[in-house]
Structure formats: C-alpha cells, structure tokens
Design a protein with these regions (language model features):
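Small-residue-enriched flexible connectors and coil-helix boundary/helix-cap motifs
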Residues: 1-164
C-alpha cells in the first residue's frame, strides 16, 4: 500500500496554531522546530489547548536568529528566546520531568496576560532530554514536548471524520 504525504505542519509552541511547511527536516526528536517551546503553569506543569483553548490562537514562527516570533489577538508581538542567563527549570509534560530553559520575565508576563493565569514559557534545547516511553521505543529514543512520539501522522479520512 502506498501513501501520500498531503501536508506538513509543525507547532513551534505546543498547542499553538499550526505552521504549514512545504518541506521539513527530520531530527531525532521529531520535525525541526516542532514543539520545542511550551507554556507551563506556576508549578511547571504543561498547558494544553484542551485546557486553555486561547493557546490555539497564538501563531508562532521561528526566525533566522533562533528566536520564536509570537502573535496573538490583542497582544503585542513577542520575540521569544531563552533567558539571557540560560536559567533552567523543571517542566512536567505527561508525567515526564524535564530540565528546560526558561524565557525571560517579559515573556512570562506576556503569556500570563494572554491566558489570564500565572504561566511561563520553557524551551527544549539540545541539553534537554525527554525519553520516549520505553514500552514503545528503542533505548535512547527521545522526543520533544509532543504528547508522546517524535512524529505524529493522521490519515485524511480520519481527519475528515473528526472535522465533520
């Protein structure tokens, strides 16, 4: 059976609006730029679009300097980068505790104002390791802040059914 890849989408910020691509670079943790940033609550637990639908209104686009440009309704554009001191904090995504880089206070204020709750951004750099569930992976397999696996695919028929 042959399959056709009809579209490629990444979510540079977990749960944000998708970014369509013509092509993508596949890395060990998934597609380049996919879910390398995430919003977390005051305790470090990840926030999703299921809990906070406003996250899905954020448009995120990587720039050539390694920053992430964020746009959201009624908010100024934000250029998101790790804090200059490269401080780290523990983040929790689906029970995985990861040591991630934090953004600066201005970025934390931006996401807190947009969501209406205390929140902050964390970033998965090369030193941040999150292993794939060992029941479904090879030793050493790692993943971004995606729900569980480096690459996620869906059949068009299933997507059509979900959207009907």
């Amino acid at each position: 059976m042959a399959a056709t890849l009809a579209s490629i989408h990444v979510y540079p910020l977990k749960s944000c609006a998708p970014m369509a691509l013509d092509s993508a670079r596949v890395e060990a943790r998934g597609l380049e730029h996919d879910r390398r940033w995430m919003a977390v609550d005051a305790s470090g637990k990840f926030l999703t679009g299921r809990q906070h639908p406003r996250l899905t209104l954020i448009r995120a686009e990587p720039d050539d300097a390694g920053a992430l440009r964020l746009r959201a309704p009624d908010m100024p554009e934000l250029r998101l980068m790790p804090a200059p001191d490269r401080a780290r904090s523990t983040a929790d995504v689906w029970g995985s505790r990861v040591d991630a880089l934090v953004a600066d206070a201005a970025a934390d204020a931006w996401i807190s104002a947009f969501l209406g709750i205390p929140a902050r951004f964390v970033h998965m750099d090369a030193d941040c390791l999150r292993n794939v569930d060992p029941d479904y992976a090879q030793p050493g397999d790692s993943v971004s802040f995606a729900d569980g696996y480096p690459l996620l695919a869906i059949a068009q028929a299933a997507l059509d059914l979900l959207n009907s």
